[in-house]
Regions:
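Structured, amphipathic secondary-structure segments that form assembly/contact surfaces
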Residues: 1-3, 9-25, 39, 44-161
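Solvent-exposed, amphipathic alpha-helical segments
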Residues: 30-41
């Protein structure tokens, strides 16, 4: 079957596309947004942030995440906690068939009632899967697994294996 390319007037080039792949920049932008939804929270925004984040997950992970996040969300609201997550390193590896292994090293600054409590280095790992477009979803990448841990623990596990 021949492929057809339609160029708009004045367009001199096209972006190659193939099944089960997207540009690296697309995956990187989605990861940045996902990390922001997970880590940049306040007492007033956590419900919306976590809802958006959960909408990008597989049904199984979504149920687990919302269940496990319930107590944390209550604590954030009760104690007026704010967290700011800043990405320091981001590694994305295409593993084939539309899957991506993502590792993010980040710094989490925590505040309670606007008082700074400190900074923690952490590692976030995700497996993303390219999925068909779905209403209510901005990205065509579904989060199939998610782990969040202290960066030192992550680095020692990585060096050990």
């Amino acid at each position: 079957r021949a492929k057809e390319y339609i160029l708009a007037p004045g367009v001199l080039d096209f972006t190659p596309a193939s099944a089960q792949s997207v540009p690296d920049s697309y995956v990187a932008d989605a990861v940045t947004e996902y990390i922001g939804q997970l880590g940049n929270i306040t007492a007033g925004s956590i419900d919306d942030q976590y809802k958006l984040f959960a909408n990008s997950m597989s049904p199984q992970l979504q149920a687990k995440f919302l269940s496990e996040a319930s107590d944390f969300k209550s604590k954030v609201k009760a104690e007026n906690i704010s967290e700011l997550l800043t990405i320091s390193e981001k590694e994305i590896k295409a593993t084939g068939d539309g899957y991506y292994q993502v590792t993010v090293l980040a710094k989490r600054d925590t505040y309670v009632n606007n008082e700074y409590l400190g900074r923690v280095d952490e590692a976030i790992e995700m497996v993303l899967q390219l999925v068909p477009p779905k209403s209510g979803r901005r990205w065509f990448l579904q989060i199939n697994s998610l782990t969040r841990q202290n960066a030192e623990t992550f680095k020692s596990k990585r060096n050990y294996s």
